[in-house]
Regions:
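Conserved Radical SAM active-site core
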Residues: 1, 8, 20-21, 32-112
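Flexible, acidic/Gly-rich N-terminal and inter-domain linker regions that tether
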Residues: 1-27, 31-35, 39, 195-206, ...
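Short hydrophobic/aromatic-rich motifs at helix boundaries and adjacent loops
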Residues: 27-29, 55-56, 128
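Conserved AdoMet/S-adenosylmethionine-binding subsite of the radical SAM
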Residues: 76-219
Length: 219
């Protein structure tokens, strides 16, 4: 596997916001989002080739029962099943951050998925499939990074369709701003004006970009 970095920090977003976790960042992605803030994990050769067992060993060495596997896009790696299975077996509650353009490989008791549905501002919305979002469970997270009213419309449409399938969207739904692109109050007002987002979604900001310099790595 191509490992870009591994470090300990706090969760900056999602259902574990503020909790200390071990972050495993894998290199490589099948998308090229316009606002990507981790291009160093997408392009170039800033990575080391390591086996899944070595990543597990290093993760466990921190002594923290939580991990986030991110990228890039972690689900495109051949050893991802082996990695997640081993983390699960060792009792590590693992959040897998995926871009919505790769199928969820399997389910394990200690593993959940955070799917980032790509809105039009990303330039990658054509890669999204409702079937992938519909496969998320109550343990998972679906997030929308928005930078325009059109993005909010897209999020509203997806959440409404998921709610029609299940009675509620099933995963916990978050709406986040593209950093620096749209005023927070405008996003919140937009959520209030859209029924599905008002009823089911939560607004969030990336906490780590408030605590540290937004461009800082390893946090």
């Amino acid at each position: 596997m191509r490992l870009n970095e591994i470090f300990m920090s706090i969760e900056g977003e999602g259902i574990r916001t503020g909790a200390t976790s071990v972050f495993v960042r894998l290199h490589g992605c099948n998308l090229r989002c316009s606002y990507c803030d981790t291009l160093y994990a997408v392009e170039g050769d800033d990575f080391a080739e390591v086996h899944a067992e070595e990543i597990v060993r290093r993760t466990l060495s921190y002594g923290i029962p939580r991990a986030t596997v991110t990228g890039g896009e972690p689900l495109i790696h051949g050893e991802i099943r082996e990695l997640l299975e081993a983390l699960d077996r060792n009792g590590v509650e693992t959040n897998v951050e995926t871009n919505g353009a790769a199928d969820i490989p399997a389910r394990w008791p200690n593993v959940f998925y955070t799917m980032d549905w790509k809105t039009p501002t990303s330039g990658m919305s054509g890669a999204m499939r409702m079937s992938r979002a519909a496969s998320l469970t109550e343990r998972d997270v679906l997030k929308f990074v928005v930078g325009s009213e059109r993005d909010l419309d897209e999020a509203e449409s997806v959440v409404r369709e998921l709610a029609s399938l299940h009675g509620d969207p099933r995963p916990t739904v978050y709406v986040s701003p593209v950093f620096g692109a749209m005023p927070y109050d405008r996003i919140v007002e937009g959520m209030r004006m859209r029924t599905a987002l008002r009823d089911f979604a939560r607004f969030q900001v990336q906490l780590h970009k408030i605590v540290w310099d937004p461009k800082r790595r390893g946090v």
